[in-house]
């Protein structure tokens, strides 16, 4: 029988692998490279000097080859490990890794819903429409950058960054509210159409879900140093 500590480390390792794949998929689907995310340039500067990749990111293929296999392996291993664990606290810790894997899988699915609009409208000749979609890209990029910073920080700062990510969930709700207010203004001054307003609001909602799923997964996967 596998020891609990060994099972948790195995789950963490595979979950990190799943996160790394998700991270790369999200970054490329919103038009950024790993270098962009890890740089110290502002996303405003990056967006001003960067062109979209000519080819679309095939999210169906990437989900099947980079996400689904790992997701199913984590769920299978977790379920088998839980059979041998009677302690409720330990069982819950294993369950958390299941949920983290589920959140990362859902991230890719939700990304598929907004990918086409993000690429289309962030390059729109309508500067007001483009700005709203580039805000979505910037917000996602900032989140990925924050998570990358989390992974290289020492124990003391790690706790603070985790707390900031948790606060980020509340900030996401504020962004939704601000977006609604802003697009209503754009409609009132006829800078965007009603159809474009609906697209912005729907895509912002899905972008928020993606961010929440990433944060929830990261809280589990990268909290090793503050949970032991």
Locate predicted features:
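Cytosolic, long alpha-helical scaffolding segments
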Residues: 1-228
